[in-house]
């Protein structure tokens, strides 16, 4: 039975599959067990709890509690993972009882659309987002955690404005987290409030700390590269980095290259081409760096190296020499801006970058393109969608360069105020003699 609707009392569920098994029940010489299909490669605790509820509902209907429940993860040749329900029963009953008690003691009017991971795919997300924004919800403060929100509410701080106006030092000792972390989110809320009241994006520079922020900015070099990946984690068993984009200057002229990879062989080739380009460019510009925004790109490079067992020494050289520079890490320790998220797109008003690709068009193109990739139909990708996604990728690469240049201006501003901001040490990426001898 596919998408079987289940109900018992006030509890309802809809299992992906009810599988008939040989076990006598009130239905006859057979009974049913729940099977759920998931996109996640690792089964999470919430999935097991979900299956426990389905199984309990099935048990009420057929007069026999199923012994097992099953999960079909992606790329498993449709072989289910089996979970013995008795192993999780006690915990399930505790969680279910706690939830029921919570609902029984709460006025239905007191429910509130707190942000959760399901918001990303929920049809009510727009309405809930509007309510949170109308209410100046604390979740709109960049970098705040749910634990911090809970503790702030315990002390009567329920909105971003109240947090922005909270006296420092904090008038209480946090039960969870440090005083510094609460001071940090208070200051973040203050800058966001100032930006809203001024009608423009405000920012302030943080005091430099050795090893963080602006002290991690290397000397700009004519050979510097700015790169960004577009990937889809649901293509095949391991995902696909389908566009490797990088931006650089040659003879004073700006260049962008987008290496498309719509299958495994092309992905390997694109990875090798990019690494070879960087290594060859190092011969001409030995002090170049490769800039990116966030940790995705270095992680993707390592995955590709491991997946295809290629360019290990070359990537090792780049990592040892700290050639890769994460500007998100620099920003987090150097700038406090009146934004709700430190996405590079939210920061672009600071450094004056205007995108060529319109984000609504990009979102639609990405959706269509990735559906083709996930459906193993790369030939179905429209040329217009590919062009839109490539412009979007180029925007990300060029925006990263604009951000680096803007950070250099802020660094110089502090230096002119008499603040010392050293450059990071230049490191030779070659392996040590001991490692070289061991490898030989």
Kindly give the residue locations of the regions a language model identified.
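Acidic, Mg2+-coordinating catalytic module of metal-dependent nucleases/exonucleases
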Residues: 69-135, 146, 155, 339, ...
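Compact, charge-rich alpha-helical regulatory domains located at protein termini
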Residues: 133-201
């Amino acid at each position: 039975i596919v998408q079987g609707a289940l109900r018992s009392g006030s509890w309802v569920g809809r299992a992906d599959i009810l599988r008939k098994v040989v076990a006598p029940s009130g239905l006859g010489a057979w009974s049913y067990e729940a099977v759920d299909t998931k996109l996640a490669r690792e089964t999470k605790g919430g999935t097991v709890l979900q299956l426990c509820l389905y199984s309990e509902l099935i048990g009420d209907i057929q007069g026999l509690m199923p012994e097992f429940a099953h999960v079909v993860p992606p790329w498993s040749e449709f072989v289910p993972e089996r979970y013995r329900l008795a192993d999780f029963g006690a915990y399930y009953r505790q969680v279910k009882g706690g939830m029921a008690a919570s609902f029984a003691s709460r006025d239905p009017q007191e429910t509130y659309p707190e942000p959760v991971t399901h918001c990303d795919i929920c049809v009510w997300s727009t309405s809930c987002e509007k309510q949170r924004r109308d209410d100046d919800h604390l979740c709109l403060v960049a970098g705040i955690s749910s634990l911090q929100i809970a503790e702030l509410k315990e002390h009567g701080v329920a909105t971003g404005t109240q947090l922005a106006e909270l006296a420092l030092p904090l008038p209480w000792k946090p039960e969870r987290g440090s005083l510094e972390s609460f001071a940090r989110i208070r200051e973040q809320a203050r800058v966001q409030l100032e930006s809203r009241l001024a009608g423009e994006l405000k920012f302030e520079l943080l005091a430099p700390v050795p090893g963080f922020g602006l002290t991690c900015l290397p000397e700009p070099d004519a050979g510097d590269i700015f790169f960004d990946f577009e990937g889809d984690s649901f293509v095949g068993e391991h995902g696909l980095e389908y566009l490797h984009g990088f931006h650089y200057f040659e003879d004073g002229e700006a260049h962008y290259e987008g290496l498309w990879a719509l299958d495994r062989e092309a992905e390997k080739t694109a990875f090798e081409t990019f690494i070879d380009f960087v290594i060859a460019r190092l011969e001409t510009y030995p002090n170049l760096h490769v800039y990116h925004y966030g940790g995705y790109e270095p992680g993707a490079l390592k995955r590709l190296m491991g997946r295809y067992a290629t360019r290990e020494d070359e990537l090792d050289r780049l990592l040892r020499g700290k050639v890769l520079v994460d500007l998100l890490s620099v920003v987090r320790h150097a700038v406090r801006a009146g934004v709700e998220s430190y996405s590079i797109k939210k920061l672009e008003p600071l450094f004056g970058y205007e995108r060529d690709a319109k984000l609504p068009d990009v979102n639609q193109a990405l959706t269509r393109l990735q559906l083709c990739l996930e459906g193993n139909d790369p030939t179905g990708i429209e040329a217009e969608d590919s062009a839109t996604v490539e412009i979007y990728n180029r925007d990300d690469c060029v925006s990263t360069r604009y951000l680096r240049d803007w950070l250099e201006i802020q660094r110089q501003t502090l230096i002119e105020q008499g603040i010392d901001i050293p450059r990071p040490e230049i490191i030779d990426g070659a392996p040590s003699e001991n490692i070289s001898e061991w490898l030989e």
